[in-house]
Every structure is written in C-alpha cells, then in structure tokens.
C-alpha cells in the first residue's frame, strides 16, 4: 500500500485526501490550522497539526517514510517553495506541488518538485471549453495540441458501425472508449461496434480536429 503525505489542507488538498483515502491509500495530512486537521481526521490514517516550513518538524514526523508528498498550501507561494526545497533535501522520491502561476511553477521545478499541477487553471480551461460547446460533456487537454473530449453520439452516427463512419480517415480523430448505458459498461471499441444514442464517446484528436468535430455537432 502506497504511503502519501499531503501538506496543506486547502480545498484541493482536502478533496484530494478524501479521494485517495477512498482508494485505499495510506494518507497522512499536515496543516497548521487545527480546524482543517479536525475536518479531515475521519478520512485519513494520520492528521497532524504543525508547521511544514520547519524542516526539523518534518524529519521528526517521519516524512521520509512516504514515497509521495503533495504540497498543497493554497496561495502561499513562499511556503510552498520552502516546503518543496526541504522535501528535496530530505530525498523524497516524488514531490507533487501545486502552483498558482508559471513563475511559481518554474521556482518549484528548480527547488525539486518532480511534478507540478495547476488545478484552478486546468478546471477553468475545461469549463471554458464545455461552455463554448455544450455538446462536450467533458474536455481534457492532453498537451498543448492534443485533447480528449466526451460527447454524446451525434444523431447521424446512431446505428452505424465505427468502421463505416471511418472517423480517423475523415476527421483524424479516434474513439478510444465508449461508455454504454444499456447495459452499463465501459468498452474499448472495435470497428464493428454499432453506436447507440445512449452511448458516451471518449474521443482523442488534435485541437484543430476537435474544433472540426465541434462544428459537425452544432
């Protein structure tokens, strides 16, 4: 069982620890605010009140027993940088740090973060795309040029096999997963899969190709 420590119980840290605990990870949380620590106690193996900016405190706590440490200290840029530096000095294998902007991310990278996340930015981007096109049930950027989207089955595609639609040749996109509601299951489809109006498609393509599909769905 993987041991994960979460430093900082911002909204991001709080919901992350609840989800990881539900997935049966051993979670320890650290925050300087007692009320936040008390809120998370029912969900984690260990919840500690303390200042993670104190390197000696981290050592005494046994932070080196954790393979992964997630730094989620809200918008406290100086705190997250210092904590990340200490974790690097303590030879934590995986340090995932939350950044609030690109400059913050650059510094986190330099002081030792192995992965940097932008939860607010990423949620805003996804929401903007789903607002821009209500046909997109979900939008997930893979990198700067490639995205995943979830869409319902367009009426023109219902009752047709994927091989007949030939989406890759026509539009350059590929359906990688289909969520079926009747019966409920998730399928990695083959060319002979017949689309139903109740299916939900996970589609991958370049942003240009996704934009073209967007116009087809309007």
Question: Where do the PLM segments sit?
Answer:
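Cytosolic regulatory regions of ion transport systems
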Residues: 1-218
């Amino acid at each position: 069982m993987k041991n994960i420590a979460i430093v900082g119980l911002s909204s991001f840290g709080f919901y992350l620890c609840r989800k990881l605990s539900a997935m049966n990870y051993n979670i320890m949380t650290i925050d300087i605010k007692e009320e936040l620590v008390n809120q998370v106690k029912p969900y984690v193996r260990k919840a500690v009140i303390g200042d993670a900016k104190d390197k000696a405190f981290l050592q005494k706590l046994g932070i080196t027993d954790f393979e992964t440490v997630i730094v989620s200290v809200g918008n406290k840029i100086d705190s997250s940088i210092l904590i990340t530096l200490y974790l690097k000095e303590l030879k934590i294998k995986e340090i995932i740090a939350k950044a609030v902007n690109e400059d913050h991310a650059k510094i986190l990278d330099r002081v030792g973060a192995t992965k940097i996340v932008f939860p607010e930015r990423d949620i805003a981007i996804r929401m903007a795309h789903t607002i821009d096109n209500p046909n997109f049930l979900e939008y997930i950027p893979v990198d700067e040029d490639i995205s995943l989207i979830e869409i319902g089955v367009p009426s023109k595609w219902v009752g047709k096999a994927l091989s007949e639609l030939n989406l890759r040749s026509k539009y350059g996109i590929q359906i990688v997963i289909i969520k079926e509601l009747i019966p409920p299951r998730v399928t990695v489809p083959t060319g002979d899969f017949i689309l139903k109006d109740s299916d939900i498609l996970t589609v991958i393509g370049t942003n240009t190709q996704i934009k073209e599909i967007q116009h087809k769905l309007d």
